[in-house]
Amino acid sequence: MIERGKFRSLTLINWNGFFARTFDLDELVTTLSGGNGAGKSTTMAAFVTALIPDLTLLHFRNTTEAGATSGSRDKGLHGKLKAGVCYSMLDTINSRHQRVVVGVRLQQVAGRDRKVDIKPFAIQGLPMSVQPTQLVTETLNERQARVLPLNELKDKLEAMEGVQFKQFNSITDYHSLMFDLGIIARRLRSASDRSKFYRLIEASLYGGISSAITRSLRDYLLPENSGVRKAFQDMEAALRENRMTLEAIRVTQSDRDLFKHLISEATNYVAADYMRHANERRVHLDKALEFRRELHTSRQQLAAEQYKHVDMARELAEHNGAEGDLEADYQAASDHLNLVQTALRQQEKIERYEADLDELQVRLEEQNEVVAEAIERQEENEARAEAAELEVDELKSQLADYQQALDVQQTRAIQYNQAIAALNRAKELCHLPDLTADSAAEWLETFQAKELEATEKMLSLEQKMSMAQTAHSQFEQAYQLVVAINGPLARNEAWDVARELLREGVDQRHLAEQVQPLRMRLSELEQRLREQQEAERLLADFCKRQGKNFDIDELEALHQELEARIASLSDSVSNAREERMALRQEQEQLQSRIQSLMQRAPVWLAAQNSLNQLSEQCGEAFSSSQDVTEYLQQLLEREREAIVERDEVGARKNAVDEEIERLSQPGGSEDQRLNALAERFGGVLLSEIYDDVSLEDAPYFSALYGPSRHAIVVPDLSQVTEHLEGLTDCPEDLYLIEGDPQSFDDSVFSVDELEKAVVVKIADRQWRYSRFPEVPLFGRAARESRIESLHAEREVLSERFATLSFDVQKTQRLHQAFSRFIGSHLAVAFESDPEAEIRQLNSRRVELERALSNHENDNQQQRIQFEQAKEGVTALNRILPRLNLLADDSLADRVDEIRERLDEAQEAARFVQQFGNQLAKLEPIVSVLQSDPEQFEQLKEDYAYSQQMQRDARQQAFALTEVVQRRAHFSYSDSAEMLSGNSDLNEKLRERLEQAEAERTRAREALRGHAAQLSQYNQVLASLKSSYDTKKELLNDLQRELQDIGVRADSGAEERARIRRDELHAQLSNNRSRRNQLEKALTFCEAEMDNLTRKLRKLERDYFEMREQVVTAKAGWCAVMRMVKDNGVERRLHRRELAYLSADDLRSMSDKALGALRLAVADNEHLRDVLRLSEDPKRPERKIQFFVAVYQHLRERIRQDIIRTDDPVEAIEQMEIELSRLTEELTSREQKLAISSRSVANIIRKTIQREQNRIRMLNQGLQNVSFGQVNSVRLNVNVRETHAMLLDVLSEQHEQHQDLFNSNRLTFSEALAKLYQRLNPQIDMGQRTPQTIGEELLDYRNYLEMEVEVNRGSDGWLRAESGALSTGEAIGTGMSILVMVVQSWEDESRRLRGKDISPCRLLFLDEAARLDARSIATLFELCERLQMQLIIAAPENISPEKGTTYKLVRKVFQNTEHVHVVGLRGFTPQLPETLPGTVDAPSEAS
């Protein structure tokens, strides 16, 4: 037998009066005895706090607060604690012999609110030897100890092996652990559960009959049947969803016609406009292409006219240009004639001026020689004067320096500085950087010798110059003549050049004599050359017009070829007319054939659409009508097979549903009559008794009872006999077993268990052998397992049945579609594609149009070729007479050759004319050029150089002389020697100064005299040069003017210029006549071009307007196409058969659909607004938006749980198939889901009966409880009259109220509430909804009334009320009720915790002095019988004979208050035994 868990001890740490106190709790009753304020309530408060650490519930009031609505601010807990860390711990041991210490850490929180902080914790695995006080205290010395904080306690326990410490952040987790370990009787999941538990403890603590508990005994004693409520909620949710789906199906069925109408009209409205725009776009494109072709043709014509105009304009421009050139040439020829005449006169002037210049040239040369000699003498005089000046200046400077240095103080310094300066100047002039004062004398001799040598060389050159002066004048005259003829040259080349010039003069005079014959020859050749150029121009013009270059030899053959071409082209033009008529006739035939095919195309397209739909639906491709009929036969066979299979699956599914319904009956009864019989006999079904049997034991018990597994267990078979008489409404075999349903077991049979079977010995001569069933159905677990497998099978069958039903209906609709196709489209569906033939014919029509266009172009080209041939013949007639000139290729070369020879002759004539006189003068004196007389100029340069060298040598010698003279200054001698030396030097300087000044005077006078003579020579030379330059300038001007005239002024030039002018005049007249002809032709051509330009402008305007319209429409069309493709509606809108309707027909179709749509969407604001916007003809994309909006609207209306598609059209097609199947299936499902009212009544009655039996069993434990005059206590459970009436109506008269339960608008709960109101109209339901009332009526607890009754004295059984009982009787009665509640909780929670745990039972009783000794003994007896622990607080006069008693005395010692505790086990005559662990712990350290 499982031992019940017990509370071992209660430990208080740092409570008021208890520093570290452990109370060992008795297994039955623990009594706390003591006077007022001894600490009894504090001890119980510590126990309750550790048990329920919820500050929202804890409230420890005393008797002074009885009847108060609120207690003290701290609710009695803050004042029971001391400052610092406090603990309250419960040491327990459960049924598994596990020691568990649970408790709380408490600590006062500073503040006026007097709050307390609580932290619950639990300790597991603590050794039995460790006391709780040892855990939370630390001994400091013999008289002092310290309380450990919670974190130190945690660390201390973690260090102990095998000990687990848990700290909880929520009370729910704390209580969950206590429930799992068997410390409390009920799982406290919520604050409401904790409140019930606390109210129970509070009622126990303060005693009496608690109104809070007696008013809600149903909540304390009757378990909530959550499974039944959840089953009803799930059923109602399933029914609600089922009904919503059925309602959606009905709405969908009602909307189906609207869907069809809306889709049909929206498709007609949008598709007609869509195809009309597509047709218009194609028409506009065709028109634009036609305009472009006409524009291209007109442009070609205009281009041809422009080419013609350009040719004529070019020819006219050529003639205009030629006319201008001819006019210019004519004017130039006239001007040339005038220029020739002017040049002849100019040539005469030039000859006169040349003679004058020759004379001036001779005089100028003579005067130049005189001036040159004067200049040389002038330069010599200037050099001597300059040297004299320099010498005087140097001497004066030296003399001045000498005078300045006479100062005694500065003489040596000045002389030394002068010496240094002279030495530096000598170094610089002599280029001797190493010169010193000592070596100056040696260098002076060297430089004096250089000065003497330079003077001698200069005098020698001066003598040579005077001798070469005479020879130089003749050489210069001849040299100047050579320079004048040849230009600048070296003097040593003058002899060779002069001889070459004389020989060239002879040749030039010979060439000058041939000028006249060459001119005459050139004039004749130039005339022939002009005629040849004219012929070449005509030939080039002809070749350009023909587009090909021709040789001269080919011209005659070309002339004959062109004449033959003219004849052939005239014949081709006549044949082209007949060919054009044949092409036009074929074009008309093609057009008529295309029209007939376009009429047949819509019918064929409709047949193809139907055929394609059939192919998509069946996944087959049909190539002939025979394939269609064969597939139809296969379809019929497949339909028959599917129907047979569907019926088979449906039958199996119904069988599974029936079995599930049978197994789902409450109590395991497969026959509803058994429930009624069990209720009638006052018994219980055997299957209900074994309802909790496990799945593993189910086969055994099913075989054990065999056919009697559906028996009814009754308390007494003799009482059933009268009910069996005349019983007809029962199964064929009805088994009745006598036994107590509350304590029934299987001992009624003698059983031998075999392998997977049992042998039941029913009687001595009757045995039954039963094997274990493969699928046991005995017990709720076995039935649930079977139901679960059946549900899985039913899901598979339902899915298969739905698939087969869908396939059957789909096949039937496919069969109907094939039948419609055969009746309507089979005749035309497999004919050839008319659109493909139309495309071929259109291609042929385009080819014919192209052929006609090419034919017109060829005819036009032939006419052009005819005109070109005629022009070519005309041109050849002009060219052929001049073929000889064209063949003369050397004519131009001969002209160039004669022209070159003439140019050479004329150049020679000009040379003779220009240099003839100079050559005549040069010839007598040319021999002097053989040798240059000592090269006079070089001699002059050498003379000037020698003068400069002589001057430099003189200066260098003077500088060295000065250094030598100043050598004394470099050595500082005594003053006497320097004075005498200075005196000599002064005298020498003065003498040299006088001589130098005399020399300077003579040089100045000679310079002035010679300068005056040089000025006279220069004046004469300037006069001659001025006259020569003037004449030369005039001659040059005349020559430039003659050159500017650019003509050769010979004797025949004037006659040639006159002939040239007359020829150009004749050419100009011919050119003007041709230009007038071209201007007239050009005027006609421009008029034709103007007409073509106007036509072209109109065509361009029409084309661009059409193109702009096409481009604009294309942008909108692109947006439309993009929208169509993005939304996937192209297949719906692009109806090819509409392409063959006219725009008016399509517009009429769209307008009709628009009228229908306005009515259809009148109630839909969104679609109405979108439809109104779509009526704008300029915004075709809005119609697409409307179509998409319609599709979106329909998609939203489609229930995706019914139709698995987003396409409304496909949804409508599937809707016909799916709706009927879903309606049938959902109706059947609703019938299966809906539980009958009789079943509900039976479930509630069974539950009430079960709970009544349980309460009856609880009452048995209270039969012998007595307190004072109270002899017994019991709970009375009755069914309310109003609810009993409801159950009777549900089970017996439910047919009268089927209007409520069969209504689709009401759930079962609402129907139940309506029935309750109908049966009890006098009851006010308040503001509660029918759903809320119905849910309450589904809870069996609301059907019961519970009250506590006591058997008191002579009054018998009466209702237990505080006013009718004494205080002791009320306390005892209340305690009995609390024991019943605890036991009920244990029974309810047994299935939630481990089966090997029996929870602790403990109650409190404060102020037990109100009970007499007999009542206290009754409590002891009750505790012993129920294995319950009790803690009693009583004054000192209470002395129970059993249990453990603690004497509590509160003492004050040295301002320290503590409670002295002595524990005694029972009261007997013997000496009291002191209990271990009752000695007070050391007092708290001060």
Swiss-Prot record:
Q: Name one GO molecular function term.
A: ATP binding
State the compartments where it is located.
Answer: Cytoplasm, Nucleoid
**Any single biological process term in GO:** chromosome segregation
User: What residues does ATP bind to?
Assistant: 34-41
- Report keywords, A-Z: ATP-binding, Cell cycle, Cell division, Chromosome partition, Coiled coil, Cytoplasm, DNA condensation, DNA-binding, Nucleotide-binding
Query: Where mainly located?
Result: cytoplasm
Q: Which GO terms describe its cellular component?
A: cytoplasm; nucleoid
What are the start and end residues of every segment in region (Flexible hinge)?
666-783
Report which residue ranges the record marks as coiled coil. 326-418, 444-480, 509-603, 835-923, 977-1115, 1209-1266
Pfam families given in the database record: MukB, MukB_hinge, SbcC_Walker_B
List S-S links within the chain: none
User: Which superkingdom does the taxonomy of this entry point to?
Assistant: Bacteria
Membership in a protein family:
Belongs to the SMC family. MukB subfamily.
User: What does the UniProt function comment say about this protein?
Assistant: Plays a central role in chromosome condensation, segregation and cell cycle progression. Functions as a homodimer, which is essential for chromosome partition. Involved in negative DNA supercoiling in vivo, and by this means organize and compact chromosomes. May achieve or facilitate chromosome segregation by condensation DNA from both sides of a centrally located replisome during cell division.
Q: How does it assemble?
A: Homodimerization via its hinge domain. Binds to DNA via its C-terminal region. Interacts, and probably forms a ternary complex, with MukE and MukF via its C-terminal region. The complex formation is stimulated by calcium or magnesium. Interacts with tubulin-related protein FtsZ.
| Domain comment (free text) | The hinge domain, which separates the large intramolecular coiled coil regions, allows the homodimerization, forming a V-shaped homodimer.
Concerning NCBIfam families, the annotation shows: PRK04863.1 (NF003422)
Protein name, please?
Chromosome partition protein MukB
Q: Which organism is it from?
A: Escherichia fergusonii (strain ATCC 35469 / DSM 13698 / CCUG 18766 / IAM 14443 / JCM 21226 / LMG 7866 / NBRC 102419 / NCTC 12128 / CDC 0568-73)
Underlying gene: mukB
